[in-house]
A protein has these predicted regions:
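Nucleotide and nucleotide-moiety/phosphate-recognizing core
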Residues: 1-179, 190, 194-197
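Conserved active-site and cofactor/substrate-binding residues in soluble primary-metabolism enzymes
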Residues: 187
């Protein structure tokens, strides 16, 4: 089995959520970060968090990596994760505001198409670059785009010749389709609370 780490790209303050740090928002009485780590720990032997402030993560026992370039968005987080995990074959990079990750989807991202430079879901034709696996050998491409100010993740996936997980595959791995539900607005937070209340 290939050696694959997982990295939470924590991101900066969320302007539309009052400047909150998204992974520390509570859903169903539990921080999003703790929900994510509970799902990730049984699947990945190495976990990283790319974050500007290491303090909230120390108590969670996670290796914290600083962004390589500040103000460059999630591409800088992916670059930092690949650099920190140079002893691995790949890194599954995840946005820090995904509270309902499917273990089956994460396992598929770890294991499938190990030769691919990138493996990413594409539900309804829409790529999900922050719930995707990137080969460590793709770091040169990532860094060249970062250094050149070409920060769009969808363009990165196109350049890498990504292997895609299509709708049929995703329906089997994540029947509820909630893995890509993220937190951008107060309405998203309210809906997430409703989903958490309904969860078994």
């Amino acid at each position: 089995m290939p050696s694959v780490a997982a990295a939470i790209i924590a991101g900066g303050p969320a302007r539309r959520l009052g400047g909150a740090t998204k992974p520390l928002l509570e859903i169903g009485g539990q921080a999003v970060a703790d929900r994510q780590l509970a799902v990730l720990r049984p699947i990945f032997s190495r976990l990283l968090v790319v974050a500007g402030d290491p303090a909230p993560w120390r108590a969670r026992g996670v290796e914290v990596v600083p962004d390589r370039v500040t103000g460059a968005g999630p591409l800088a987080g992916i670059s930092a994760a690949l650099a920190a995990a140079s002893d691995q074959e790949a890194v599954v990079c995840l946005a820090g505001d995904l509270p309902f990750l499917s273990p089956a989807l994460l396992t598929a991202l770890r294991d499938r198409a190990p030769e691919a430079e990138a493996l990413a879901p594409r539900p309804a034709g829409r790529a999900e670059p922050l719930c995707a696996r990137y080969a460590v050998r793709a770091r040169a491409t990532v860094d060249a785009r970062l250094d050149g100010g070409r920060l769009a993740l969808h363009e990165l996936l196109a350049e890498l010749g990504t292997v895609w997980l299509d709708d049929q595959t995703l329906a089997a791995l994540d029947p509820g389709g909630l893995s890509f539900f993220n937190l951008n607005t107060p309405d998203d937070l309210r809906r997430a609370e409703e989903i958490a209340r309904r969860a078994p």
